[in-house]
Amino acid sequence: MAAALLARASGPARRALCPRAWRQLHTIYQSVELPETHQMLLQTCRDFAEKELFPIAAQVDKEHLFPAAQVKKMGGLGLLAMDVPEELGGAGLDYLAYAIAMEEISRGCASTGVIMSVNNSLYLGPILKFGSKEQKQAWVTPFTSGDKIGCFALSEPGNGSDAGAASTTARAEGDSWVLNGTKAWITNAWEASAAVVFASTDRALQNKGISAFLVPMPTPGLTLGKKEDKLGIRGSSTANLIFEDCRIPKDSILGEPGMGFKIAMQTLDMGRIGIASQALGIAQTALDCAVNYAENRMAFGAPLTKLQVIQFKLADMALALESARLLTWRAAMLKDNKKPFIKEAAMAKLAASEAATAISHQAIQILGGMGYVTEMPAERHYRDARITEIYEGTSEIQRLVIAGHLLRSYRS
């Protein structure tokens, strides 16, 4: 599948309906910094995004439309299972490749980017790392082609950042586990065919009593809540999962009982690289939009880009974007080289998400009134960017993670 993904790079370049900026402005990082295979991957994903995602992104947002046809095509390219070994149906690529692909896909459509991120990082990621051979065959391979996608159920109505305070329970009963409780803010909920679900198997042990389970969807005892009407990323569904005596087989536990909190935290560490990359894609397309508009908008007899105040804004936007990209790539490469990357992933996610919000905010300012109307994509980029500072660990949580690692290094 990796070969199929890379082969697409040799096709002709395709232009999207919006900006010449798509191809002209985004050239900073595609030459000597990347191996040839990663450059080919970048071009493949960019071509796909131009042809398949950019033209539908506004409709996806406006109509809360799940991009089913595009997700299926992404599965055929290996984009939904990028670091899954080829023998399990994946692309067999590394996390740097995943970061590059996530950015390009998210540039085309942020909703599609998060759908891709959840399936890769949050659903397949923990099964690959902690699952048995049998679980990988049953719960990974069917989710690589785009026919099925998964979701990740950790947060609850009463806890988000406090992941160890799970009130959802799982009790052993004969040859089954019985789940009760509600999981909240679940991305891909309405389209998912399976979920990694975290529940307490021993409340007395607090976070050491949390376990992870593989749950098919739909299944008796599991009800979906309403689709949330969100500010951004409106093409991905978000809903509660409600468990009422939901019975699953005993072998549905992922890892060992009590390993759930560890599995969740390690999964989020990986996922933050994906969300950082999504934020980079949003930031890049917002910058492209701002530059393209400023180059063509005349004021005082010259393009806006002749004004120093606009030049300074664009310089600050580019600085924030490039800095965040380097942090993201570093985190991905550390993971690929099996080195500690928790602090670096937190830094990447923090820098990229805050850059995306700031850059999309400034893009609206540069466009002025045109930035405030849906005729232009700038307002959508701003709405899409905001969630990247919240999900998979808020900016405040990232700062706690970074500070904790920093202080431990000084005290050791």
From Swiss-Prot:
Q: Which residues carry this modification: N6-succinyllysine?
A: 51, 129, 262, 306
The residues that hold substrate are 161, 269-272, 393
Q: Coiled-coil intervals in this record?
A: none
**Location of the protein in the cell:** Mitochondrion matrix
| Gene3D superfamilies in the cross-refs | Acyl-CoA dehydrogenase/oxidase, N-terminal domain, Butyryl-CoA Dehydrogenase, subunit A, domain 2, Butyryl-CoA Dehydrogenase, subunit A, domain 3
Enzyme Commission numbers on file: 1.3.8.1
GO biological process terms on file = butyrate catabolic process; fatty acid beta-oxidation; fatty acid beta-oxidation using acyl-CoA dehydrogenase
Protein name in UniProt: Short-chain specific acyl-CoA dehydrogenase, mitochondrial
Q: Please name the source species.
A: Homo sapiens (Human)
Extract the PROSITE patterns matched here: ACYL_COA_DH_1, ACYL_COA_DH_2
Tell me which residues bear Phosphothreonine: 27
